[in-house]
């Protein structure tokens, strides 16, 4: 009996040392967030559809997903399908994206459509005559027609195949430049002309109104479908005042661009996606700074004052120093406390919080993912066990 008791004691001790699995031990985060008016979102890649442990975690705690790359134009556009068409419009391959949205639908999870128009990594052949990279760039009207066709067909495809699942679209991503070398002098919108020295092909060949036109095409598609799909502008550093001011100027230009039959401005843009990478890029300096919480709050309210919804779309609370784990957990608690109080006091302008840095990363130092999300930036570790930051978020929402 003594041996059995000793064995049982050891087993109990071992069990106590095993980290708790979030989906087994805790109420869903999205259930706790619902009374405060916002969804809880997670990223999903096509490869993760084969990771059942990750899928279980997402199902347990999140009621919104964002496909990381698979709904972007460079993923959907297909040259073979394009050249097979007889109308001269672009063709798409929805295979990977459809599987991901199907999974979301099967599990009662909404999808943020990300993204219809983004200059980064955009396929060059989309802008060329006859879609041939060896030929000159096509004229402006051709690019407008292609973009309208692309946006209309993509929005229509997902709404008709998965009604109501894609509840919002990032129509345009990161169109605001960061430095005066990236936008024209005197442009209050800071509309991006260059990205890392390369021209913004949408602005170059579609024109300075390409953002407003993209929203117009998307709004027309949504209204034709009779869908309740919200249309967002999405950008990083959207809580820094200078960039936020330019974003507001851009959205104001979008929402005064087109008029209805009565001459009233059509609100083409419904909301702002604040990506939410918080802290230094690749370095600990600038991470876990309490003043950032107030800055985020202030800009959410500034966007809301324009009649816009807000979502935190790609949040990563960066941490490059493992010894700062407790401080980071406390920072996460302050952040969610602010979200809850802000919505309670201001009519729920914040509609979703999507966490991009969901897990830690083992990407090598200096790697893009290392810099973007940080090695210790997750709510969960590399094995998907909960971290103190998750517990703090949970306790804050549950109070």
Please give the residue ranges for each predicted region:
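N-terminal structural segment of carbohydrate-active enzymes
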Residues: 25-70, 82
């Amino acid at each position: 009996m003594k041996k059995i008791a000793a064995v049982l004691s050891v087993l109990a001790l071992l069990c106590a040392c095993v980290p708790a699995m979030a989906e087994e031990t805790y109420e869903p985060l999205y259930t706790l967030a619902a009374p405060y008016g916002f969804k809880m979102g997670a990223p999903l890649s096509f490869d993760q559809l084969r990771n059942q442990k990750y899928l279980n975690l997402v199902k347990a705690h999140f009621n919104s997903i964002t496909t990381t790359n698979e709904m972007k134009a460079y993923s959907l556009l297909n040259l073979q399908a394009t050249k097979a068409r007889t109308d001269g419009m672009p063709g798409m391959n929805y295979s990977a994206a459809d599987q991901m949205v199907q999974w979301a639908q099967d599990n009662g999870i909404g999808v943020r459509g990300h993204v219809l128009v983004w200059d980064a990594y955009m396929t060059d052949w989309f802008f060329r005559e006859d879609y041939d990279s060896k030929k000159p760039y096509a004229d402006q009207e051709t690019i407008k027609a292609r973009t309208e066709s692309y946006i209309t067909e993509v929005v229509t495809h997902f709404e008709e195949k998965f009604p109501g699942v894609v509840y919002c679209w990032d129509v345009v991503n990161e169109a605001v430049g960061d430095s005066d070398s990236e936008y024209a002098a005197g442009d209050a919108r800071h509309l991006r002309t260059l990205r890392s020295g390369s021209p913004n092909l949408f602005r170059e060949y579609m024109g300075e109104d390409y953002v407003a036109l993209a929203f117009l095409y998307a709004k027309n598609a949504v209204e034709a479908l009779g869908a309740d799909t919200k249309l967002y502008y999405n950008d990083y550093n959207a809580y820094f005042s200078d960039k936020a001011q330019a974003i507001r100027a851009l959205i104001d230009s979008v929402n005064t661009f087109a008029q209805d039959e009565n001459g009233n401005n059509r609100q083409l843009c419904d909301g702002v996606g604040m990506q939410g990478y918080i802290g230094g890029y690749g370095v600990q300096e600038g991470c876990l700074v309490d003043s950032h919480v107030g800055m985020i709050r202030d800009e959410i309210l500034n966007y809301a004052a324009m009649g816009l919804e807000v979502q935190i779309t790609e949040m990563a609370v960066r941490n490059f120093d493992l010894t700062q784990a407790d401080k980071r957990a406390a920072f996460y608690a302050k952040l969610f406390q602010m979200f809850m109080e802000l919505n309670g006091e201001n009519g729920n302008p914040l509609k979703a919080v999507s966490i991009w840095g969901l897990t830690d990363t083992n990407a090598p130092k200096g790697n893009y993912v290392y810099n973007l999300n940080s090695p210790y930036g997750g709510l969960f570790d590399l094995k998907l066990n909960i971290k103190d930051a998750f517990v703090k978020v949970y306790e804050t929402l549950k109070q």
